[in-house]
Design a protein with these regions (language model features):
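Long, terminal "pre-/pro-" and other extracytoplasmic accessory regions
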Residues: 1-88
Length: 88
């Protein structure tokens, strides 16, 4: 008998984010990525969707044209940049 383990945590995050976008609670990731491209040119390496301190956030890791890696944290409800940190 085969038993499935169920969706992976990343899949659950995706489903939760999609439901929140459809309900109008948060902005779609595409909107945030458009803003990131305009404000912080580079190549996106990773995106995470989380709930931190009572708010939904998109954490975006990118590499700029100088090869520096940055972690950006945006409020998923209003696209406000909450944190910008250069990774070492």
């Amino acid at each position: 008998m085969l038993c499935g383990a169920g969706p992976a945590p990343a899949d659950e995050d995706h489903l939760q984010a999609r439901a929140l976008v459809e309900a109008g609670v948060i902005l779609p990731l595409e909107r945030i990525l458009d803003q990131v491209a305009a404000e912080h040119p580079g190549r996106v390496l990773e995106v995470e969707f989380e709930r931190e301190q009572g708010r939904y956030v998109y954490e975006i890791e990118l590499v700029d044209d100088r090869g520096r890696v940055w972690e950006l944290e945006y409020d998923a409800e209003n696209a406000k940049l909450l944190e910008k940190e250069r990774e070492d």
